[in-house]
């Protein structure tokens, strides 16, 4: 999983060049809130994938913090028995994010339009 984190981190820097550690930390807090509100395993895996992707952004600035975060995520996914599904979900969500249009406003990136990942 660490190799996937590193690869996404490199791509993250290209997609979100103005991202900063503070904005990525705030984004992780948002994703963790969404995880708490997840309804069922499917939603939880999707939100954990979002958390992983944000951790890839954090990895750019604080690698040890990101690795600690994904360690917790990985343990949770393994306990649920969804590691293979989780890895596919990360890849699919990241590929989807790369197709979106992004806007940088108030120190954060937000996708524009109404496209949604299902």
Positions of the model-derived regions?
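Flexible "arm" and connector segments at domain edges
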Residues: 1-118
């Amino acid at each position: 999983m660490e190799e996937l984190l590193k690869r996404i981190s490199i791509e993250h820097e290209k997609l979100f060049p103005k991202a900063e550690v503070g904005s990525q930390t705030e984004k992780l807090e948002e994703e963790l809130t969404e995880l708490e509100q997840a309804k069922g395993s499917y939603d939880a895996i999707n939100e954990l994938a979002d958390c992983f992707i944000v951790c890839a952004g954090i990895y750019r600035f604080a690698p040890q913090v990101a690795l600690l975060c994904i360690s917790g995520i990985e343990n949770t996914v393994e306990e649920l028995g969804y590691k293979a599904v989780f890895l596919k979900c990360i890849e699919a969500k990241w590929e989807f994010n790369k197709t979106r249009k992004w806007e940088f406003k108030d120190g954060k990136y937000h996708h524009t339009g109404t496209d949604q990942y299902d």
